[in-house]
Design a protein with these regions (language model features):
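Non-heme Fe(II) oxygenase metal-center motifs and adjacent flexible, charged/small-residue loops
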Residues: 1-134
């Protein structure tokens, strides 16, 4: 069982399209991936707050490959070190792929902030490798 945002998730079979995206993600990242989280952002009020994908089940220096489909959304990153005031903003456009790897999760937080003016949806698939199940 893998827990995400306080929710225990169970295993489901890979659909053909998700399996195809997994293969693309593995080729782009040169990594083996065995799990995907699929999130639906119904509109700009759906968001994910500042966090790092640093759960122990992901191991050291996890590789996260993220596909975005639908309306573009903002993606922000900032250092975990509160004394470091750097901030970066990216656009997750339809069809884009973002890869976080190396020690990114150890040193950075990221979020998809609320954007109240957005009225259409976005689907996000994040592939990763789960090293152990608690």
């Amino acid at each position: 069982m893998y827990a995400y945002s306080g929710i225990n998730l169970t295993h489901n079979a890979w659909s053909p399209i998700v399996l195809e995206l997994k293969t693309i993600a593995e080729n782009l990242s040169s990594s083996k991936l065995n799990s995907v989280l699929i999130n639906r952002y119904r509109n700009g009020l759906d968001s994910v707050s500042w966090h790092a994908d640093d759960e122990k089940e992901l191991g050291d220096d996890p590789v996260i490959v993220s596909f975005s489909f639908g309306v573009p959304r903002k993606f922000q990153i900032k250092p975990k070190d509160k004394s470091d005031k750097r901030r970066y903003l990216f656009s997750l456009d339809h069809g884009s792929v973002m890869i976080m790897h190396g020690n990114f999760q150890a040193h950075w937080l990221h979020q998809v902030p609320k954007e109240p003016k957005i009225e259409t949806e976005r689907i996000n698939l994040t592939f990763r490798y789960i090293t152990s199940v608690s």
